[in-house]
């Protein structure tokens, strides 16, 4: 805890390096995982570095605010190069999901008349393909190398809990999902706690994968590892952790 001269108390986090308090951000090494200063960004809303990949849905069903705005991987690289993160003392950049999302609009179960694009990245169709609206494999490798040259980590937000309903994986394996309906006939959507915590769907168009089953868990851990084996990511932020069973985490870290 820290206290002011007038007796006000608050908790404060002090980064340490070899037992010594770090007072300058540049003294924090990117290998000191417990001392990182993170910057979380949503790629589409961060910076547009390559207008050639801009692709709005331009649908009358979608408000402009929930359509694609043009942010991309090249935009992150540009901000690394111009010192944006360094000036803030950032040592780790956490980026939103980069995998391919749908090309059309989808509504929410609670209000199907309100439709959204997948600008956020949390509706994966392909788990090992960079969404072309965000960039290319080469642009991703360039961004990661640029961050590492600047002594910064990059962690990837990865979605293992669900796939978009249009995913070829789900079309080939429709039985890989949990049940949409509960025994009492209610839809198992948004049932976040209790017995349904590991089976509930976020919405009808993003079915939850039943990763309690080995034949489902194995390919989902393989696709997570794809990004660190084929690209130089420094780690993950896993989406919807509380809704994914323990066996997935054991398999991933085995």
Language-model features: locations:
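Substrate-binding/active-site clefts of carbohydrate-active enzymes
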Residues: 46-231, 249-254
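Compositionally biased low-complexity segments at domain edges in trafficked proteins
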Residues: 25-53
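Short catalytic-loop micro-motif centered on adjacent basic/acidic residues
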Residues: 155, 235-241
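Extended acidic/polar, glycine-enriched regions
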Residues: 1-31
């Amino acid at each position: 805890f820290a206290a002011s001269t007038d007796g006000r108390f608050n908790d404060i986090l002090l980064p340490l390096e070899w037992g010594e308090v770090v007072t300058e951000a540049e003294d924090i090494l990117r290998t000191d995982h417990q001392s990182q200063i993170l910057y979380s960004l949503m790629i589409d809303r961060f910076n547009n570095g390559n207008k050639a990949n801009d692709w709005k849905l331009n649908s009358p069903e979608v408000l402009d605010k929930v359509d694609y705005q043009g942010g991309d991987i090249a935009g992150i690289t540009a901000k690394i190069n111009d010192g944006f993160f360094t000036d803030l003392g950032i040592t780790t950049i956490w980026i939103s999901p980069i995998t391919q999302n749908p090309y059309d609009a989808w509504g929410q179960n609670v209000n199907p008349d309100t439709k959204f694009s997948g600008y956020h990245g949390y509706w994966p169709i392909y788990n090992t393909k960079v969404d072309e609206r965000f960039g290319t494999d080469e642009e991703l490798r360039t961004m990661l190398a640029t961050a590492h040259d600047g002594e910064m980590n990059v962690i990837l937000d990865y979605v293992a809990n669900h796939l978009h309903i249009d995913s070829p994986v789900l079309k080939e394996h429709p039985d890989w999902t949990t049940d949409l309906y509960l025994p009492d006939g209610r839809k198992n959507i948004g049932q976040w706690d209790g017995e349904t915590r590991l089976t509930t769907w976020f919405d009808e168009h993003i079915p939850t994968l039943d990763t309690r089953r080995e034949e489902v868990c194995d390919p989902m851990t393989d696709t997570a590892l794809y990004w660190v084996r084929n690209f130089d990511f420094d780690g993950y932020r896993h989406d919807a952790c509380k809704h994914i069973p323990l066996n997935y985490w054991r398999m991933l870290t085995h």
